Amino acid sequence: MVTGYSRYAVSDTLSKGYLIGRGGFRIGVCGTAVLRAGVNTNLRDISSVTVRISRQIRGISEPLVEELWGSEGFPSTLLLAPPGAGKTTLLRDMICALSDGSETRPACRVGVVDERGELAAMYRGVPQLEVGAHTDVLDGCPKALGVVMLLRAANPQIIAVDEITAEEDLWAMLTAANCGVTLLATIHAADREELTRKPLFTKLLEMQVFRRLVTITVEHGRRVYRTEPL
């Protein structure tokens, strides 16, 4: 069972409306919210679930990483796409590529803040999905806190996070950038025009944390990756 026969063990993620299963699949849960002081603490009377199966496709990011890699190494990069377009799959493979290195690139120390368990799918401290040989993972940790923890404990060259959603995430990444760490992250938007209408992105541009933007689109049934300066 996903809960390990213990509702208490999954109470934190369940209160946020999802569960993470072994192997990386994610289960969205709907039901009646149990509120305390305006904060959801649990779900009862479960009415439906939605299973999202994680896919790992090795090698899809290799041409992209080669294109982005420059004389100073890998630049801080933001991945942009609407939900379901493959941001997390691409991000995970980029983490692998950067962590493992290649014949033309050195391996990098990569720190991953896997707040929702979708990147590494940790199970009892072991990644169920490949994230590279030189990767440290903080599982179930809020991004803003996790970035600071990695800076203190893991000596990363690159820090990767999935789905920037809050301003405190930006401030933590600004701290990392000021420490000389490269950043790799995703954000929801269909295109750059939509992104510029988001107040969070305006703040992100002001901080000048990211150098490159990768836009993911689906054209004729195939995913296309386009890069541009940010």
Where does each model-flagged region fall?
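Conserved P-loop NTPase nucleotide-binding/switch module
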Residues: 154-213, 218
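Conserved lysine of the Walker
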Residues: 87
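P-loop NTP-binding catalytic core
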Residues: 7-74
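The conserved Walker
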Residues: 83-84
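C-terminal lobe/lid and adjacent interdomain/linker elements of RecA-like ASCE P-loop ATPase modules
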Residues: 123-126, 131-139, 187, 197-230
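Hydrophobic positions on the alpha1 helix immediately C-terminal to the Walker A/P-loop
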Residues: 90, 94
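Hydrophobic anchor at the beta1->P-loop junction of P-loop NTPases
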Residues: 77-79
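P-loop NTPase switch/communication element
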Residues: 99-148
